[in-house]
Amino acid sequence: PPPPLAFRSRARRGLEEPGSGLVGTVVVAPDLGGSLVVVPGESPAPGTGTVRSVRVEVEAGLPVDGEVFAAAVLATLNDPRGWSVPDGVTFSRTAADDASIRVVLASPATTDRLCAPLATESRYSCGNSVTGAAVLNFERWVLGAPDFGDDLATYRQYLVNHEVGHVLGHGHEDCPAPGAVAPVMVQQSISAQGCLTNGWPVP
């Protein structure tokens, strides 16, 4: 297997931006074994509409402050630019087993196992409307994607919104025209297809 990727905490611009949850020396280990830890905590849904409860899980061994990560996930989902307007939803946080959505941060190999039969190639993430799980690949959380450059904060918001978008039933979209703002369901982890990168359903 490839050796772990390691970064000093400030080796890349944006690595420790608020909401990343990253702590200390950040090592991207290929496989941490798959033990998932539920981040404790609850918060009510702040908006109107259909309430979707969200449970946040972090794989044991990741250099992540789970509470900071969970708060960032819920802040992204409940942002006015998020899914609340187009889908009429609002998101609460729970640690209960009956959560309607699970957001999981996992090592590349664990992501592959959780996303199967979809082939994520240890590089990508997934969201599944049947299982209710949005699995975020930790390597992507740390490295971002080429078209986003150093804008890791926006990429992380994109990653949450895109994969939870799948959980909500949204499929992939294409860039409508070169230079246009990319719909959030474009596979921007691979390429923005000539569009401007965007992390939000309603930018």
Model-derived features with residue positions:
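Active-site-proximal beta-strand/loop segments in catalytic clefts of secreted hydrolases
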Residues: 58-59, 105-108, 137-139, 170, ...
